[in-house]
């Protein structure tokens, strides 16, 4: 069953358009230098996520919700794969990521940046070795559709690592989807959605304290995370 959008939003399409507009505005004002500084600052969150699927040599890796490349370029620094495909709905974010991919330290690697809907991936079935996604699932109105797409495109034995915030109290329907608030679910709900999509949780890492530290120190502009006392987890998923 698909997730129900919040009552204050008219439709999943409306949620997507508002979210896309918000991130296009945010990323168009962020240069490559700022994006690289953010990648360094968030390494305490990205590195544990990557460690769930390491090593990545000779793998086809997909980063869902690449944005400006905070996770993707950290992958290239730690364990370069055969091919890295970054997918996002934000043209502005992808523009920054494409620029960074041309830097001398990254241009030797094989990278594709694709603008697409994460609920309808432009990828062939059973073509991907590893899927990564960081702080993206909560932006999607239909999380089950996105998880089913992940299950469709991964090869047998593939690994999937997803991290995001999870609510610890009642649904926050009056809050913003764009800030990863209204779209948050509980860990239990996430587990059920994964099972419905043919995926199961093989491991997890609690990164709540790391995110709290980043937000408190002004390294991650996400005050709502603290205001709503959310958890942040990284999950390793495999196909059932």
Stretches with model-predicted labels:
Residues 1-31:
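N-terminal, positively charged/glycine-rich alpha-helical extensions of SAM-dependent methyltransferases
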Residues 39-59, 74:
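Conserved alpha-helix/loop element of class I SAM-dependent methyltransferases that forms part
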Residues 62, 68-120:
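Class I SAM-dependent methyltransferase SAM/SAH-binding core
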Residues 130-141:
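A short SAM/SAH-binding and catalytic strip from SAM-dependent methyltransferases
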Residues 144-156:
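A short glycine-rich, Lys/Arg-flanked "PGG" loop and its adjoining helix->strand segment in the class I
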Residues 165-181:
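Short, glycine-/aromatic-enriched active-site segment of Class I SAM-dependent methyltransferases
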């Amino acid at each position: 069953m698909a997730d129900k959008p919040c009552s204050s939003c008219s439709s999943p399409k409306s949620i997507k358009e508002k979210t896309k507009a918000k991130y296009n505005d945010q990323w168009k004002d962020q240069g490559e230098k700022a994006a690289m500084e953010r990648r360094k600052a968030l390494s305490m969150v990205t590195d544990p996520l990557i460690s769930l699927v390491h090593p990545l040599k000779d793998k086809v890796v997909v980063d869902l919700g690449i944005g400006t490349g905070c996770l993707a370029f950290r992958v290239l620094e730690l364990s370069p794969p055969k091919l890295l495909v970054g997918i996002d709905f934000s043209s502005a974010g992808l523009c920054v990521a494409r620029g960074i991919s041309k830097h001398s330290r990254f241009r030797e690697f094989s990278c594709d940046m694709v603008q697409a809907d994460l609920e309808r991936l432009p990828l062939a079935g059973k073509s991907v070795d590893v899927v990564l996604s960081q702080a993206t699932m909560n932006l999607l109105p239909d999380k089950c559709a996105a998880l089913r797409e992940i299950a469709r495109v991964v090869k047998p034995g593939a690994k999937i690592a997803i991290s995001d915030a999870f609510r610890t109290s009642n649904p926050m329907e009056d809050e913003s989807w764009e800030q990863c608030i209204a779209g948050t679910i509980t860990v239990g709900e996430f587990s059920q959605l994964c099972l419905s999509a043919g995926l199961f949780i093989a491991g997890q890492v609690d990164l709540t304290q790391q995110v709290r530290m980043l937000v408190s120190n002004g390294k991650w502009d996400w005050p709502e995370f603290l205001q709503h006392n959310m958890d942040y987890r990284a999950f390793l998923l495999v196909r059932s």
